[in-house]
Amino acid sequence: MKKLISLVSLFCLSVFLPLSVMGEPIDREAVVKRHRVCTTGTLLKSPAQVGNGKFAFGMDITGLQTFVPFNTLSDWSWHSFPLPEGMRAEDYRPVVVETHGKKIAYELRNPDQPELSEWLTKNPHRYNLGRIGFRLLREDGTEAREIDLGNARQEIDLWTGVVYSRFELNRKEVKVRTVCHPDKDMIGVSIESELLNDGNMSIYLDFPYPDGRYFKHYIGRYDTISGHTSTFEKLAPNSVRI
C-alpha cells in the first residue's frame, strides 16, 4: 500500500510540477545578466572578447589591447605565405576515411602531400589581424603599465554584448565601452576621461607580421617591421584609411 501511495505521489508530482513551472514565463534577460563576467585584472589566457561569429576582438582590462597583444580574429585574411614551389591549392586531395560503413572525404592533412597540407593549415592568416590599444602616460610622461591603474574593473554584459571597463590613472577615472558590429568586422569604442584632454591618453595601432603559428594565445611577430608596410590615406578631417 505504501508503495502504491508513493507511486501515486510521484505521478502527481510529475504531472502537476511541469504545469506549474510552464505557467511562469522565464525572464531570460534577468537570468543571463545574473551571469555577467566581472574581473579586476587582465586574464592572460581568458580575455574578454566581443564578436559576431565571423569576427572577434580580445581585450585586456582597459577595453582594448593596451598591455597585452590578444588576437584579433576573422574568417578572412589579408596575407598568406607563398605556396610551395610548383604547387597549387587546388591540387590538394582530401583524405578518404571510412565512417559507419561509408567512405567520406575529409579535409585533413594528407600524408602524401605534407608540404601542401602544411601550407593549407597555416594559410591564409586569419589572425592576428592587428592590435588596437591605448597609449597611457603617467604624470611624469613615461608609459603607464597595468600595475599603475587603480580601481580597475571590467564587466561583460552577456545580454547586450557590451564590455564595460573602468580604471583610474593619475587620479583620473577612465570609462570605456567596447562593442562589435553585428554584421561587419568592426568594433566601436566609447571613451570618457579627462586624460584625453591633457594628452595622457591616445590610441595606437600595431600590425604584426605572421609567424606561421596557429591555435595559440598570442600570434604574430611585432619585431619584423621590414616584413610589411602600412600607408595612410586621409579621407576626411577625422577619418583615414590604413
What residues fall within each predicted segment?
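Beta-sandwich/jelly-roll carbohydrate-recognition scaffolds of carbohydrate-active enzymes
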Residues: 24-242
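Bacterial N-terminal signal peptides
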Residues: 8-20
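A residue-level detector for conformationally permissive "hinge/kink" positions
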Residues: 6, 15, 43-45
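Positively charged n-region of N-terminal signal peptides that target proteins for export
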Residues: 1-4
